[in-house]
């Protein structure tokens, strides 16, 4: 490898392997044998373990390698891509329940209800796999970036949740993590002494700070891109990416058909939880002032009274993902911005 093999993802497995699966069945290999073979492949993806620092191991909850496999979705012509191998991939994962492969299921209005149910049954096992990706949002998103419709329909997932166009693009798809909760913290500190501030003012200040720090993030990301080009070209990988040979350019020099880096907004659920608690306890219930809340944060809730406040913030107010639109929409507004 030209890298550390992290996030060596396998793309739309059920698409490109389906022909071989069907051919084996026609040639007399039993479904049971093929199921065992696929199970062994899933187990094999757990052989490679990246050595991480203790902090990284804590952050990643172990040593995942990001062997992500994408299932379902659409064909390039716009039909549902779900097939019998899609089902088998989930069935075999249910048998092993290991950290890898990291399965991702693409859903859209054409998805078979039975496959959607199979996906839900697998999630219910509690491993956090598979992840769900919404074609109705992602495909138009790629179109907005100048990607052709056929290529946009053929996207896959790489690493954790990053989106890519297999064989057609190079990008540091996880080049930066934009901490939305940190932006909220900055905004609270900037306004803690303003006794007339409203909740809407806080939201607008958060958006203004997003603009400010996104620009800094872009500058930093451009430096990383340039550094990769100058100090770490990857000629072997470039041989397998469309247009690189024709252009005579390494992927780090922009030789691929599509070239863009990816960033992630993180802390979305925490942002919703925090904004909702802020709205309730400061602006609606008026139990404490904004300054008192920031002071509690600065002290890390040390002391009896601050501990009571911490317990109330955790337990009293609804949280993201519990069918409360008011909570969920707080982060939706920020993300759409």
Regions found by a protein language model. Name each.
Residues 1-337:
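Conserved catalytic cores of very large enzyme subunits
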């Amino acid at each position: 490898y030209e890298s550390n093999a992290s996030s060596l993802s396998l793309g739309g497995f059920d698409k490109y392997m389906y022909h071989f699966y069907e051919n084996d069945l026609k040639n007399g290999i039993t479904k049971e044998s093929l199921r065992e073979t696929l199970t062994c492949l899933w187990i094999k993806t757990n052989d490679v373990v990246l050595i991480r620092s203790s902090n990284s191991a804590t952050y990643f909850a172990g040593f995942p390698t990001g062997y992500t496999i994408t299932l379902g979705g659409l064909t390039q012509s716009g039909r549902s891509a779900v097939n019998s191998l899609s089902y088998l991939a989930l069935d075999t994962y249910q048998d092993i329940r290991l950290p890898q492969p990291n399965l991702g299921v693409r859903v859209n209005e054409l998805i078979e209800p039975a496959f959607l149910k199979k996906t839900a049954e697998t999630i219910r096992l509690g491993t956090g796999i598979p992840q769900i990706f919404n074609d109705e949002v992602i495909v138009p998103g790629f179109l907005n970036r100048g990607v052709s419709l056929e290529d946009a329909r053929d996207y896959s997932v790489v690493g954790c949740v990053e989106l890519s166009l297999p064989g057609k693009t190079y990008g540091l798809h996880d080049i930066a993590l934009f901490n939305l909760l940190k932006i909220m913290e900055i905004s609270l500190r900037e306004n803690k002494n303003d006794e007339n501030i409203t909740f809407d003012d806080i939201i607008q200040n958060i958006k203004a700070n997003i603009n400010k720090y996104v620009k800094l993030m872009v500058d930093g990301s451009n430096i990383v891109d340039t550094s990769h080009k100058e100090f770490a070209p990857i000629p072997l990988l470039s041989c397998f990416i469309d247009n690189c040979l024709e252009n005579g350019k390494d992927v780090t020099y922009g030789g691929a058909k599509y070239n863009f880096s990816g960033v992630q907004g993180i802390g979305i659920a925490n942002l919703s939880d925090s904004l909702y608690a802020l709205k309730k306890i400061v602006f609606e219930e008026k139990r404490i002032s904004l300054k008192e809340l920031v002071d509690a944060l600065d002290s890390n809730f040390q002391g009896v009274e601050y501990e009571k406040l911490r317990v109330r913030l955790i337990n009293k107010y609804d949280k993201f993902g519990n069918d409360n639109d008011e909570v969920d929409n707080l982060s939706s507004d920020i993300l759409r911005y």
